[in-house]
């Protein structure tokens, strides 16, 4: 059984979907005012990890992620660059899709965009107005937080804390902690003519409407960065539970730790933002997945040269063992029992248990490392077979080794020719063949009575 840490209850809980075997889940996506960065990658990859674990367990995931394609940040960027806001949005959404494809993130069920759901959002705002949960000000329509009794249940902020805002907005509200559902038309800003007037949606109502349109008025899992707990997710809950008359709106809230650069917060003001494509180009996509998933998802992830080098060492060791085990299994058969079999099975169970324990990837990696240590001491068929099975299930969940098509027959024939040259002691020619194969990504290991090859994936 899968256990997840639920921010809503502040504890680890057994995962039980509302409509088994289906799992409905929503991830807060990007606001495409700029290129996606490694922090966004981590959120997408943790979502991908959870979906692969659910599929491993036999569930059918229905996953949705959005694009907030109209927002204050987009308008500001458009003004700074003197560029149409729609162009900025389209460029940066394409950038996200390029990155997700490179990292082989599972496609989502739907990628809703705010501008495609303006009428849905306006209708939701009108419903809240009509039922007394919202009120009109001069600049916006606001949610009346005092009308919702459970405010603060997610963040633990019970004092109805306000956030930074301009004086004229404070004066426009009943209470400083009320938040905008709909922003009325302002000079020089995009707007839509709707049932609640000319304007555009507020930040929080967008996710409430889009998620429930595709997943229903109640669904299983909501994911996002830990920086969204307050006010975004707290406000989502308040408006959704009043809008749909449900409690709880979402059963499990999963929050992902922030990315740091050399121990410091990643931010534009510090100039240490790492763009997604830049990071993927420097380190191949498979390793990017491995590195960004190797720290427990709830903890901060620190990107530093030291941490990357440590991860590269582990990744290379695992990759070499995976390829060697694959080659042995493809080329040998044995019916011999080995005493290490039981130990490997224990470590395999430990690895799977770690994945199911709140996606504990560091422990899962450590368990696989224990299997590799046994295999490296005894690279024979029965151990190789079990090692390969462990790698295959690990990769079903982590997807950190992408398969590349290889013509096995041709490679095997070349290896046999090389072995013949070695038997005839034509070592110089045999070494030349080895070097040529290595340049093509085929690595060779010579043992006393056999040669094992594998693709350096």
From Swiss-Prot:
The protein's enzyme class? ligase
Q: Where does Zn(2+) bind?
A: 28, 207, 232, 236
Identify the residue span(s) of motif 'KMSKS' region: 265-269
- List the GO cellular component terms: cytoplasm
Keyword annotations of the record: Aminoacyl-tRNA synthetase, ATP-binding, Cytoplasm, Ligase, Metal-binding, Nucleotide-binding, Protein biosynthesis, Zinc
Could you tell me where this protein is found in the cell?
A: Cytoplasm
Q: How is the cofactor bound?
A: Binds 1 zinc ion per subunit.
Q: What is any one GO biological process for this UniProt entry?
A: cysteinyl-tRNA aminoacylation
State the EC number(s).
6.1.1.16
* Source organism, top-level taxon: Archaea
Can you name one GO molecular function term for this protein? ATP binding
Cross-referenced Gene3D superfamilies: Cysteine-tRNA ligase, C-terminal anti-codon recognition domain (1.20.120.1910), HUPs (3.40.50.620)
- Quick one: which residues bind ATP? 268
Keyword Acyltransferase listed? The answer is no
Needed cofactors, names only, are: Zn(2+)
Fetch the CDD domains from UniProt: CysRS_core
Catalytic activities: tRNA(Cys) + L-cysteine + ATP = L-cysteinyl-tRNA(Cys) + AMP + diphosphate
UniProt similarity note? Belongs to the class-I aminoacyl-tRNA synthetase family.
This one is known as Cysteine--tRNA ligase
Q: Which organism is it from?
A: Nanoarchaeum equitans (strain Kin4-M)
């Amino acid at each position: 059984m899968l256990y997840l840490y639920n921010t809503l209850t502040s504890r680890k809980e057994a995962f039980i979907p509302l409509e088994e075997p289906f799992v409905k889940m929503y991830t807060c996506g990007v606001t495409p005012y700029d290129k996606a960065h490694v922090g966004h990658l981590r959120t997408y990859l943790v979502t991908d990890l959870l979906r692969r674990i659910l599929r491993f367990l036999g569930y059918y995931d229905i996953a949705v992620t959005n694009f907030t394609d109209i927002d204050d940040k987009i308008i500001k960027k458009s003004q700074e660059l003197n560029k149409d806001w729609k162009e900025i949005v389209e460029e940066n959404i394409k950038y996200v899709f390029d990155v997700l494809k490179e990292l082989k993130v599972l496609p989502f069920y739907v990628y809703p965009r705010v501008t495609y759901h303006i009428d849905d959002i306006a209708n939701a705002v009108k419903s809240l107005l009509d039922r007394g949960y919202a009120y009109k000000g001069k600049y916006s329509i606001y949610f009346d937080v005092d009308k919702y009794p459970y405010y603060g249940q997610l963040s633990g902020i019970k004092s109805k804390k306000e956030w930074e805002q301009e004086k004229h907005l404070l004066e426009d509200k009943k209470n400083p902690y009320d938040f905008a559902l709909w922003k009325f038309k302002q000079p020089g800003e995009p707007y839509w003519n709707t049932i609640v007037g000319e304007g555009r949606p507020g930040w929080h109502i967008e996710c409430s409407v889009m998620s429930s349109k595709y997943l229903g008025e109640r669904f299983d899992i909501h994911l996002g960065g830990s920086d969204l707990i307050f006010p975004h997710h707290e406000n989502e809950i308040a408006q959704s539970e009043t809008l749909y008359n449900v409690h709880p709106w979402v059963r499990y809230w999963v929050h992902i730790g922030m990315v740091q650069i050399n121990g410091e917060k990643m931010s534009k003001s510090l100039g240490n933002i790492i763009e997604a494509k830049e990071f993927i180009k420097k380190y191949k996509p498979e390793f990017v997945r491995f590195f960004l998933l190797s720290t427990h998802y709830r903890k901060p992830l620190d990107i530093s040269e030291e941490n990357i080098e440590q991860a590269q060492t582990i990744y290379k060791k695992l990759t070499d063992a995976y390829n060697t085990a694959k080659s042995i299994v493809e080329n040998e058969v044995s019916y011999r029992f080995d005493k290490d079999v039981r130990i490997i099975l224990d470590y395999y169970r430990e690895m799977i248990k770690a994945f199911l324990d709140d996606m504990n990837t560091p422990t899962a990696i450590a368990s696989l490392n224990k299997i590799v240590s046994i295999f490296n001491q005894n690279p024979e068929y029965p151990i190789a077979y079990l090692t390969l099975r462990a790698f295959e299930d690990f990769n079903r969940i982590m997807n950190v080794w992408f398969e590349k098509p290889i013509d096995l027959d041709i490679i095997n024939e070349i290896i046999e020719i090389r072995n013949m040259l070695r038997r005839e002691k034509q070592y110089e020619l045999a070494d030349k063949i080895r070097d040529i194969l290595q340049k093509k990504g085929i690595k060779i290991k010579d043992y006393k009575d056999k040669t094992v090859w594998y693709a350096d994936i």
